[in-house]
Swiss-Prot record:
Protein name: Transcriptional regulator YqjI
General function of this protein: Represses the expression of YqjH which is involved in iron homeostasis under excess nickel conditions. Also represses its own expression.
GO cellular component, one term: cytosol
Subunit field text: Oligomer (probable predominant form) and monomer.
Matching InterPro entries: Tscrpt_reg_PadR_N (IPR005149), WH-like_DNA-bd_sf (IPR036388), WH_DNA-bd_sf (IPR036390)
Gene3D superfamilies in alphabetical order: Winged helix-like DNA-binding domain superfamily/Winged helix DNA-binding domain
Pfam hit, one: PadR
Amino acid sequence: MSHHHEGCCKHEGQPRHEGCCKGEKSEHEHCGHGHQHEHGQCCGGRHGRGGGRRQRFFGHGELRLVILDILSRDDSHGYELIKAIENLTQGNYTPSPGVIYPTLDFLQEQSLITIREEEGGKKQIALTEQGAQWLEENREQVEMIEERIKARCVGAALRQNPQMKRALDNFKAVLDLRVNQSDISDAQIKKIIAVIDRAAFDITQLD
């Protein structure tokens, strides 16, 4: 069953048309920019704040799985899902309604969730049997997504440390200066690579 859902659309939130997506959303969701993208990106800081490199939290199909996993614990509403994802990423990424609701529409079209209107205009979102089955078929991927998000959140916290930021900025500046020299030789490049590899290894050996 998973091949039908995972392969029917190239982008999160895009409805299926004759077996594929005919359109591509032109919006992108980056930190500090009022654009939207279904994959969800952040800058190591809270969505809506500028600065830092963009970092993608969710790849193709991953936001759908995260939403289904949240719904497997309890029924929800759109704004609650947004908050749950924000909590999952420790505030580093907050999906906009323009990302969440098209994705929910897609999941409903695939019979993975139901959306029922309640009194007051709220819409209750619930997981279907098909949705639960697809989620279980992809449980290993869900766990990998969660582990990757935890690691990225730790990295974002480290980058907020002033000394860590200074050290990283210094490293990037020196590397950029040396590598972009017009007269740099192959031997010098190999030495730089060896230094980077050695530093990476030394970091892995720290207690």
